[in-house]
C-alpha cells in the first residue's frame, strides 16, 4: 500500500487539501502536514532561524506552527515518517492556478520541489479558478494522475506542476503535457492609511492573465484540459552558456 505525504500552502483547513486527502485514502496511507495559516506566495523558504512546533489535528494529520510548505515536507518526512520515503510528495490542491512565472512565488510548487530535492517523486496540484472551486471534482483528476505516476514513475530531477480546470470531472477534455507559459499582468503596490495616520501597503495584481500560446500551461487549462508541466531542479540556462564565455577572459 503506497504512502503519500500531502502538504500545501493554503493551510491545513483549506478545502483543497482536505478534498485531496479524502480522495487519496482509497489508494493508500495519506499523511498530511500543512501550515497553520495561509502562506500563499511564500515560495521556497525554509525556516532556519526559529524553532518549529507541530500540532496533531487527527490521525496522520498535523499542522506546523509558523511553518512553510518546505518546512512541512521536512517535518513530515524526517519526523512523522522517520525518514522512510513516501511513494509521493503531493502538494495542493491550491486555491487558484500556478502558471507561468508565478510558480517562482508558489508555496504549492515549492512543496513539490522540496520533495524532489529530498529524492522523492513529487507533484503540485492547483485549481484553475478562484471562486466556487469544485475541489471534489478536481481531486478525482488528481487521483487519476497519481495512479498513472505510481505505475510509470517520474524521471529523476523532475517534478510535476499540474493545473486543473474548475470543471466537472466528465467535462474535462483530457490531459496535456505543456511548457511553462508567460504571464500578461503586473503587480501594483496599493497604499493605504491606517487609523493612526501611518501608511501601509498591499501588493496585488491589477488583473490576472497569461499569454495563451498553444502548448503552454495557460492554453491547456483555458481550453478545458489538465496541464501537466515537467519542472526540474537544474536552473542552468544551457542555451546561453557559450554566449557569456567572454566572462572567462582575463581582465
UniProtKB/Swiss-Prot annotation:
Listed InterPro entries: SurE (IPR030048), SurE-like_Pase/nucleotidase (IPR002828), SurE-like_sf (IPR036523)
Keywords recorded for this protein, A-Z: Cytoplasm, Hydrolase, Metal-binding, Nucleotide-binding
Leading EC class: hydrolase
Cofactor: a divalent metal cation
Enzyme Commission number(s): 3.1.3.5
Reactions it catalyzes: a ribonucleoside 5'-phosphate + H2O = a ribonucleoside + phosphate
GO cellular component, one term: cytoplasm
MF GO annotations: 3'-nucleotidase activity; 5'-nucleotidase activity; exopolyphosphatase activity; metal ion binding; nucleotide binding
SUPFAM superfamilies linked: SurE-like
Coiled coil spans: none
Textual note on the cofactor: Binds 1 divalent metal cation per subunit.
UniProt: a divalent metal cation binding residues: 9-10, 40, 94
Matching Pfam families: SurE
Record keyword Membrane present: no
Location of this chain's protein in the cell: Cytoplasm
Similarity comment: Belongs to the SurE nucleotidase family.
Physiological role: Nucleotidase that shows phosphatase activity on nucleoside 5'-monophosphates.
Record protein name field: 5'-nucleotidase SurE
Organism listed in the record: Aquifex aeolicus (strain VF5)
GN (gene name): surE
Amino acid at each position: 500500500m503506497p504512502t503519500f505525504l500531502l502538504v500545501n500552502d493554503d493551510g491545513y483547513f483549506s478545502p483543497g487539501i482536505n478534498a485531496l486527502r479524502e480522495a487519496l485514502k482509497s489508494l493508500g496511507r495519506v499523511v498530511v502536514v500543512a501550515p497553520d495559516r495561509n502562506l500563499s506566495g511564500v515560495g521556497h523558504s525554509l525556516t532556519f532561524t526559529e524553532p518549529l512546533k507541530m500540532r496533531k489535528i487527527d490521525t496522520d494529520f498535523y499542522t506546523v506552527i509558523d511553518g512553510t510548505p518546505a518546512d512541512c515536507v521536512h517535518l513530515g518526512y524526517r519526523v512523522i515518517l522517520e525518514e522512510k520515503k513516501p511513494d509521493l510528495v503531493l502538494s495542493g490542491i491550491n486555491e487558484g492556478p500556478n502558471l507561468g512565472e508565478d510558480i517562482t512565488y508558489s508555496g504549492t510548487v515549492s512543496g513539490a520541489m522540496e520533495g524532489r530535492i529530498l529524492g522523492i517523486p513529487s507533484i503540485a496540484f492547483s485549481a484553475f479558478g478562484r471562486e466556487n472551486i469544485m475541489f471534489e471534482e478536481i481531486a478525482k483528476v488528481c487521483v487519476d494522475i497519481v495512479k498513472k505516476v505510481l505505475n510509470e514513475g517520474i524521471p529523476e530531477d523532475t517534478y510535476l506542476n499540474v493545473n486543473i480546470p474548475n470543471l466537472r470531472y466528465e467535462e474535462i477534455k483530457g490531459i496535456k503535457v505543456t511548457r511553462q507559459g508567460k504571464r500578461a499582468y503586473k503587480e501594483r503596490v496599493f497604499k493605504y492609511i491606517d487609523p493612526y495616520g501611518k501608511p501601509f501597503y498591499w501588493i496585488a495584481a491589477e488583473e490576472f492573465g497569461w499569454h495563451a500560446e498553444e502548448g503552454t500551461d495557460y492554453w491547456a487549462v483555458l481550453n478545458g484540459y489538465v496541464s501537466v508541466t515537467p519542472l526540474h531542479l537544474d536552473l542552468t540556462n544551457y542555451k546561453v552558456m557559450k554566449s557569456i564565455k567572454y566572462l572567462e577572459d582575463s581582465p
